[in-house]
A protein has these predicted regions:
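Bacterial Sec-dependent N-terminal signal peptides
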Residues: 1-26
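Beta-propeller domains with acidic blade repeats across secreted/periplasmic ectodomains
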Residues: 24-436, 690, 738-741, 817-819, ...
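C-terminal capping alpha-helices of c-type cytochrome domains
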Residues: 62, 130, 697-709, 766, ...
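Short pre-active-site segment immediately N-terminal to redox-active cysteine/selenocysteine motifs
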Residues: 80, 129, 466, 540, ...
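Gly/Gly-Pro-rich "capping" loops immediately C-terminal to redox-active cysteine motifs
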Residues: 100, 110-113, 742-767, 778-826
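C-terminal structured "cap/appendage" subdomains that terminate the fold
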Residues: 379-383, 388, 397, 609-615, ...
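The canonical Cys-X-X-Cys-His
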Residues: 382, 404, 723, 727-739, ...
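Long, ordered, helix-rich scaffold segments
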Residues: 396, 409-726, 745, 752-754, ...
Length: 867
């Protein structure tokens, strides 16, 4: 029976266009057409038949950009007369009047601006001038910030001034310019390949550091090796370009941003697609840019996960993509909900998202909605025109066919301008009060210290940042002797950063670090009672140890033993986050028990990310191994060789193994020679899934109505641990992102409880083809000469269309010349097979449902036990 069931499951998977996972629906999501029709062969922008908008909205193609003459447009802006300005990524600026309602743009009205400027990524009219941010790949002019003015008074811009040259390279360079809310200054957004420029002030404390306890592994393909923080910086500059201040840092590649009506800045940051399915992968995400914030980008494996106390969490994680333009809907003749939305553009997936922000504490949470989708639809920028209230969207970039589209509302809801309700919550006021101390100030310690244990993370960040800006002599003693252990760990984390020097940033001219201070910090941390700390404070305690070790040095032997005694009893913990930091720290300290405990975690971890993280930490451990335990560790690499991930995934696995082999003694290398010489057997995704299901027998063919009835009364006293285990057992983690773990080839299921009730979620699982998430609908590509491929369009470059043909493996791609395409047709069959629940028992299904609907929160009421 078991073998037969697995064969049935494999057959079901093989029958799908390619392996992927369950579709999640959204009531307001625009629907893709059932038939896409002929491919684009002529040199015209994507036709409207390939583009769909949210209900009630209309999209019009107003202009197909002649690429040979006007290039490929990446940025839009307005001048003081309301004329639209567009920039060619590798050329100049073009200006034209607003097209008449319902009419296309007359090509004769598109004029190249007669100014010596090119490669503009940011456009802003302010202070009677046109400011532009230049990011010139070809280095024909300096990248940086320029001001263009009318020197003769004839109404034509003719004078170009370079306000600041900046060193930048590739896509991740100098980007958007935004008028500050007070209309007295300008914010500049830069990517992580822009070298930091001189600044008189910084809201972010200038204690730059990588802060890796274990040796960082660089990207396996060499991307950004050697690039250190700070990176991805947002600056504020004066109109004359002379005064500069760092506002925030730690972004990968933010292209644009927008201020809401309360003056809060939001941006949309890029993921690192090479990191797919690794523990350090971070999806594209919307971030709230607060004073002194740091969002944790570092190269290679060094990216800080959201749970680290020395970074901040995203407002909302979006998923894989390529962020471009950002704008709020203010001034649009849209319903109020859409006037207040933050619009973010995803170039690679061809989407405009409407992000609906909701104040929470001193920051925000959000939900996302697919507002416009198209294929191909490489969106680059969007603006709201104040004269007609329409949204104008450009496509282009990387020399692909460019176009300009108009989006209007034609539905029945009111488009009366939405009334602004200022966010005057006490927590916002408190955060902003603390942010005023993000510079030296005699009152800062007194004002900030009480809030180091505030329950609101952004308030806590603002308080700690205020402390870090003050001379450490004013507060080091207070930190070391603080009686409140929650405040102590926050203060000592700050003291470790400000009192030590990160070795990657240490200069020859730097004075030696104060080892006496390091001993005091360690001794103070040793006195902290673990059991009196909340989970977040426990994470801060461990991280404070890590930063202290990194910025000062490894503690002496006697202190190492004391620290191990302090932390080891709490490992393993109840959460992946705590286990991540505990395993890493105890491995660094060469705890005698970490090898055994870490291997138990690897065996029981349901995701490849979690397994990979523990394996990464154990690679340098030399103590506590038996020969059999060593074998068990190296046998894991045979399993890992068949895991799928981004372009650097296999290299990361190789790096971990190489380090582990190098950590072996000569004697151990001889003992383990057979397993070290053994080569992994490559297996298909179907074989891997069959192995995961091995040992399970067919239970029954579960029906929707039956399961719905059981779930109606069975969602209490569930098991979080078993639910997570089942999520891995039936292959969900292989395709789905969930609570910052899992694959990227199916919809992110973290927010399922906001989209589904229990019955609807079961319906999606039992009947996966009933409604397929458009983002993951496989497309069949047919060329003029009859060649076929099935997959998802993942990249465009010039006339090249790239398709991912194996959704279990992001690296399986095939490229086509778009001029050679005959058709693109969507499949009506979900990549997710039916019957995945048929090998689970009733209680296992209920635990699985509870896990999904809990958004991965172990303290959800569904997991509360009867007293």
């Amino acid at each position: 029976m078991k073998k037969t069931t697995l064969l049935i499951l494999i057959a079901a998977l093989a029958a799908t266009p390619f392996s992927a996972s369950a579709a999640a629906k959204k009531k307001s999501r625009p629907r893709r057409p059932q038939t896409v029709g002929p491919a684009i062969n002529e040199n015209k922008a994507t036709p409207i038949s390939r583009i769909k908008a949210a209900p009630g909205f209309k999209v019009e193609l107003v202009y197909s950009v002649p690429g040979s003459n006007q290039g490929s447009w990446v940025n839009l802006g307005l001048d003081d007369k309301g004329r639209i300005i567009a920039s060619d990524q590798f050329g100049g600026l073009y200006r034209f009047p607003l097209p008449a309602p319902g009419k296309k743009l007359d090509p004769k009205l598109v004029k190249k601006m007669p100014v010596n400027i090119r490669a503009v990524n940011g456009i802003l009219w302010a202070f009677d001038a046109l400011y532009v941010a230049v990011n010139d790949y070809e280095r024909k002019i300096d990248s940086g910030v320029y001001r263009i003015t009318d020197s003769t008074g004839d109404g034509e811009l003719d004078k170009v001034e370079k306000l600041r040259a900046m060193q930048a390279s590739g896509d991740h360079g100098v980007h958007a310019l935004l008028l500050s809310p007070d209309k007295k200054s300008i914010h500049l957004i830069t990517g992580n390949n822009t070298e930091p420029t001189a600044s008189q002030k910084s809201r972010v404390p200038r204690a730059w550091g990588e802060d890796h306890l274990l040796t960082r592994m660089p990207d396996g393909r060499g991307h950004n090796r050697g690039r250190l923080g700070p990176a991805g910086i947002i600056y504020k500059m004066s109109p004359d370009g002379k005064q500069w201040e760092i506002i925030s840092s730690g972004y990968r590649n933010i292209f644009d941003g927008g201020f809401n009506r309360d003056g809060e800045l939001f941006t949309y940051d890029a993921d690192m697609e090479y990191d797919f399915n690794t523990p350090w992968y971070r999806p594209t995400r919307v971030n709230h840019v607060t004073s002194g914030s740091m969002y944790g980008w570092r190269n290679g494996t060094g990216k800080r996960p959201e749970f680290y106390p020395d970074t901040l969490p995203a407002t909302i994680n979006i998923g894989p993509g390529s962020p471009t333009g950002v704008t709020f809907g203010y001034g649009a003749k849209f319903p109020a909900k859409y006037q207040n939305a933050l619009y973010i553009l995803d170039w690679s997936w061809g989407k405009v998202y409407a992000v609906h922000l909701k104040p929470e504490g001193s920051s925000y949470t959000a939900t996302k909605e697919e507002f416009i989708i198209g294929s191909p639809f490489p969106v680059t920028d969007a603006i709201i025109h104040p004269k007609d209230g329409a949204m104008y969207v450009s496509i282009g970039g990387r020399r692909v066919q460019s176009g300009l589209y108009r989006v209007t509302y034609t539905g029945k809801e009111s488009t009366t301008p939405a009334k602004h309700q200022p966010n005057r919550s006490k927590l916002v006021s408190l955060r902003k009060k603390l942010e005023k101390f993000h510079s030296p100030n005699a009152q800062a310690i007194k004002q900030a210290w009480p809030h180091l244990t505030h329950s609101d993370r952004f308030v806590r960040w603002a308080a700690r940042t205020a402390v870090m800006h003050q001379p450490i002599k004013q507060w080091s003693g207070k930190a070391l002797k603080e009686k409140d252990h929650g405040k102590r760990v926050e203060a000592l984390l700050a003291l470790s950063k400000m009192g030590g020097i990160d070795p990657s940033h240490r200069k020859d001219s730097d004075a030696p670090v104060d080892t006496g201070l390091a001993r005091k910090i360690v001794n103070s941390l040793l006195q902290v009672d673990w059991n009196k700390l909340q989970t977040e404070q426990q994470l801060t305690l461990i991280r404070a140890y890590q930063i202290c070790f990194n910025r000062f040095d490894r503690p002496g032997r006697s202190n190492v033993e004391k620290i191990v005694q302090h932390l080891d009893p709490h490992f393993p913990a109840q959460t992946f986050e705590l286990n991540w930091l505990l395993c890493e720290t105890l491995a660094y300290l060469q705890s005698p028990s970490v090898a055994y405990k870490g291997m138990q975690l690897i065996k029981n971890a349901p995701t490849q990310e979690e397994q990979m993280e523990y394996a990464r930490s154990l690679r340098f451990v030399k103590q506590g191994w038996s020969t059999s335990l060593r074998r068990e560790y190296f046998e894991w690499f045979f399993k890992a060789a068949n895991y799928r991930g981004g372009a650097s995934f296999s290299k990361f696995i190789e790096f971990i193994r190489n380090d582990a082999v190098a950590s072996l003694s000569r004697t151990d290398q001889v003992k383990l020679k057979d397993i070290l010489d053994k080569k992994p057997v490559r297996k298909s995704p179907l074989e891997m899934l069959a192995e995961a299901m091995a040992g399970r027998s067919y239970i029954k063919e579960w029906k929707l109505d039956e399961l719905s009835k059981i779930a109606a009364t069975g969602m209490k006293n569930r098991s979080y641990a078993n639910g997570r285990k089942m999520f891995g057992a039936v292959g969900c983690f292989a395709c789905h992102r969930f609570a910052n773990e899992g694959g990227m080839t199916g919809p992110d299921l973290t927010g399922s409880s906001g989209r589904y009730n229990t019955h609807d979620l079961l319906d999606q699982i039992v009947n996966p083809s009933k409604e397929i998430n458009e983002q993951f609908v496989p497309i069949e590509v047919i060329t003029l000469d009859g060649r076929k491929a099935t997959g998802i369009v993942v990249n465009l470059n010039g006339d090249s269309v790239t398709v991912n043909t194996d959704m279990f493996d992001p690296n399986q791609r095939e490229s086509f010349d778009r001029k050679s395409l005959k058709s693109l047709e969507p499949s009506k069959v979900s990549p997710m097979p039916e019957g995945l629940l048929n090998m689970l028992k009733k209680e296992e299904i209920l635990d699985l449902l509870a896990y999904v609907l809990s958004a991965g929160e172990a303290n959800n009421a569904m997991f509360a036990k009867k007293k």
